[in-house]
Amino acid sequence: MSQASTEIVRISGHAGTVPGAGLNREFQVCKLVDTTTCIGCKACEVACLEWNGYTFSETTFDNTYQTMPETAWNYWNLIKFNEHERADGTMMLLMRKDQCMHCADPGCLAACPADAAIVQYANGIVDFQEANCIGCGYCMTGCPFNIPKFDPPSRKVFKCTLCNDRVSVGLEPACIKACPTGCLHFGTKSEMKELAETRATQLRDHSGFQDAGVYDPAGVGGTHVIYVLHDAKNPELYGGLPKDPRIPWSVRLWKAPLKWLGNMAIVGGIVGMALHYMRFGPKKVEPIPPDVSPHGTPSGSQNDERRGQGRPS
């Protein structure tokens, strides 16, 4: 595919948009995951580990096909399994590829106070710059998908980058190259939405899945990873996919009105001190009279005179 723009449009620790240098490409990229054709082979998990330089580790998540309960700081791609009993009593194995959703309105970026620790490129990818991460973990509370994960030894937070290093030079993400069934697709956002809607229509019209649809939640401005689901009305069945994800109200409150009020309070305090100084001047200390001690008692010769008056003649 063509190269997508790596121009920075937003960074953490700054309000509004931030222009940056990048490739002169305007389109936004998108990954489409068709859960109806996923076989749970985990080839995408292996490809993600290998491309990003992480080693395999033994897991203890037994009695399930799933590798581990959730993604980890060094395990960004995870196939989630759920055995769902249908209305007719038959069992259906639902599988979903779990990774960063690369939201158009990312909660992690909104919550992060560190300068340029999180960046959003013009192609839609949300990337972490670990060198600028301060390890506060606020991004973890801002994400409605529970994706950013903290690494205690390094005190940094990590997540899927949508293989931005590959995408920026015209390559597909590693997980998509490894998929044997073609359930993963990559292209522009408009192309992937059209392909997803076509597939959902096929499922409704020809496969008996009347509730099939596309998962591209509006609560976070849409995402650059979208899903085709058999049952789009109940996304929670697919490994806990939130039905209506939104940035937590606490993050919105802290980053908008409370931050503004705090700044206004600081400015008001500075202005108040300046006005007080201009009206009353610097604080003046009244000098102590030379014949009075700090405790208000007579001093010097007066004390001697009084002591002399009290002596018998």
Model-based region annotation:
Residues 1-313:
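Non-ligating segments of multi-cofactor redox enzymes
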